[in-house]
């Protein structure tokens, strides 16, 4: 298998909102906030659902890789409930090998409320549910060892058990790629993420804000120097400034495609990683 992903198995619930909904609910635009089930339901109670689809950061990337013709797999925990069944069906429909056997869990399948504002930005409120209970016993070691690359998400560090799954996957992987996931996620786990990037990852994906925060700088030239010294591949998205890939002394920059109508930025970074 080319690539296996391990991440939070989340069902995305997409709703359109005005900017004042974000501020009124003390949310920070364009970021992800962890919420409990009651807060999730409270937020959703005043909204109209536009779409419900299988999601999760790494899962989105894995689906993208499948659509590009790669043989891929995914490990993520869902409950044996209606949403969990739909999640598995969604992955299989996209030709993703799903290496997890559902069973009845105490918590429901994880859900993410994705709030789309008029400028097409997305703000996420995630109730991890069963997804946040993934542990080392859920990692299919054979599937990991038989994959060229294991792709992980920084969000796995937000709970205790998933960290063990993360570490087991790294131990058994041929090559490891990781997305830093979110600016606040980087801030929560900065020392751990910096150690991972320097010592354990082969490929790192980040946006400009995340990588600046990780190395404690406001100067992007310092990011370039860091990338050169790192000696491993680091790929950074920079919004309107395009993207850049750094590997030792080799730097490749890509401009954005202009005059596109942006409808929804949900999963944009995930598909870029694919």
Whereabouts are the PLM-identified features?
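Conserved phosphate-binding/catalytic region of the ribokinase-like
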Residues: 3-9, 23-29, 46, 191, ...
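Conserved phosphate-binding/catalytic loop of the ribokinase/pfkB sugar-kinase fold
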Residues: 99-104, 114-160
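Glycine-rich phosphate/adenosyl-contacting loop at the front of the ribokinase-like
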Residues: 1-75, 85, 262
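Cofactor-binding loop segments of dinucleotide-utilizing enzymes, especially the Rossmann-like FAD-
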Residues: 6-8, 77-80, 103, 116-118, ...
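Conserved beta-alpha-beta core of the PfkB/ribokinase-like small-molecule kinase fold
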Residues: 149-224, 232, 241-243
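Hydrophobic beta-strand scaffold residues
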Residues: 72, 98, 176-177, 234
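Short beta-strand scaffold segments in enzyme catalytic cores
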Residues: 111-115, 123, 242-246
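A glycine-rich helix N-cap at a beta->alpha junction
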Residues: 90-107
